[in-house]
Amino acid sequence: MSAAPPRLVVGLGNPGAEYSETRHNAGFWFCERLADTLGVRFSHESRFHGLVANAREAGVWLLMPQTYMNRSGQAIGALARFYRIAPAEILVVHDELDIPPGQLRLKFGGGLGGHNGLKDTSAHLGTNDYWRLRVGIGHPGDRNEVVNFVLKPARREEQTLIDESLDRALAAWPTLAKGDWNTATQRLNARPAPPKPPKAPKAPQPAAADQPKDESQP
């Protein structure tokens, strides 16, 4: 397992306002949050087919491909080759059908889970051996509904859970930036604790004037 810190963080998604709030753009959502945290702005780089930000102090590039999901690897491969970034130094953040909203999975290499953005990324990098942060969006329950599902906005309660998971991922960024992948994996892959139920309000105590008098005394 790679121990090198990431030099390139990629958020997968589709360009355009019509896709900006759809489940498939979860990777973009994380990259936008990370750019805000690092104090950098994206600009379009035609040679890299995407929106690019250079966080020099953090030593990391941020990339949001503008090639549409199924051709994400074109952008990733172009930037990685130009700056000589090894696949093991790349973190790809993407939506994941097989994980419920609110949960995350950090993994290195392995299968692609049928994700077209990952398939194209692996094709252009020539390997599956790069880091992925899988952002749970849930599954519609019917494989025939998957395309329609990922290209629609999440329900309000689901979006709240997804946003909370992205906040947890952002909180783990300092650990990721150091290349401490083991600690980050343990932290991000743990299921979030369920919210504690609110405490029942205490019954009001009667005021002293309302207390019954003791008639046994003379």
From Swiss-Prot:
Keywords: Cytoplasm, Hydrolase, RNA-binding, tRNA-binding. Hydrolyzes ribosome-free peptidyl-tRNAs (with 1 or more amino acids incorporated), which drop off the ribosome during protein synthesis, or as a result of ribosome stalling. GO terms for cellular component: cytoplasm. This is Peptidyl-tRNA hydrolase. Its EC number is 3.1.1.29. One of its GO terms (molecular function) is tRNA binding. InterPro entries: Pept_tRNA_hydro, Pept_tRNA_hydro_CS, Pept_tRNA_hydro_sf. It is found in: Cytoplasm. Belongs to the PTH family. Monomer. One of its GO terms (biological process) is rescue of stalled ribosome. It is an enzyme of class 3 (hydrolase). It catalyses: an N-acyl-L-alpha-aminoacyl-tRNA + H2O = an N-acyl-L-amino acid + a tRNA + H(+). Coiled coil: none annotated. The active site is at 24 (proton acceptor). It comes from Azoarcus sp. (strain BH72). Residues 192-204 have a biased composition (Pro residues).
